């Protein structure tokens, strides 16, 4: 996308309005793309973190923008998977005609990447719970915790999805 001549038209499927993940994911994305004026969010609407709403909103985006859409940024994988259905039903090829970026790194996203329908999923690991419980046990045992506990997460482009898929815990 960086080497593309002209504007890069982005449509955004936001999470549930007012939720911390939706706010943070929008803010973080906008901070990154503002560094290059050719990246333009042409449409942005809530998909409520659901597959059905993601499909419905993407259908509306496609009716309004059609082939002008270069990138779909979805705040979660479920909305992206719904949007993929809408893109296919519109006769387009997801991950080819429209670059698709989503967040969570769930099993369905890996399946979509392996099928060549999703370009990249940015992991948001649900495995924070076990780390939290371990920290609670350590506190109860009188141990000192590190100042910061980091949950390992990754960025998974479609090219590595098949290799990484067997290692997924969720």
Predicted segments — roles?
Residues 13-21, 32-33, 124-170:
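Hinge/cleft segment of the Venus flytrap/periplasmic-binding protein
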Residues 12-13, 44, 115-126:
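Short beta-strand elements at the ligand-binding edges of bilobed clamshell
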Residues 1-27, 32, 36:
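Extracytoplasmic substrate-binding proteins
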Residues 29, 42-43, 47-111:
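Hydrophobic alpha-helical
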């Amino acid at each position: 996308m960086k080497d593309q001549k002209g504007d890069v038209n982005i449509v955004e499927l936001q999470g549930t309005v007012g939720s911390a993940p939706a706010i943070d994911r929008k803010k973080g994305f906008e901070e990154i793309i503002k560094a290059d004026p050719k990246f333009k969010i042409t449409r942005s609407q809530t998909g409520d973190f659901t597959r059905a709403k993601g499909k419905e909103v993407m259908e509306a985006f496609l009716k309004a923008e059609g082939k002008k859409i270069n990138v779909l940024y979805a705040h979660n994988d479920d909305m992206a998977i719904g949007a993929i259905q809408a893109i296919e039903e519109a006769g387009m090829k997801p991950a080819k005609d429209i670059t698709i970026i989503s967040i969570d790194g769930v099993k369905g996203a890996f399946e979509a990447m392996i099928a060549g329908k999703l370009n990249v999923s940015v992991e948001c690991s649900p495995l924070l719970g076990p780390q939290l419980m371990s920290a609670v046990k350590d506190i109860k045992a009188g141990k000192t915790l590190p100042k910061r506990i980091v949950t390992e997460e990754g960025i998974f482009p479609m090219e590595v999805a098949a290799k990484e898929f067997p290692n997924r815990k969720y």
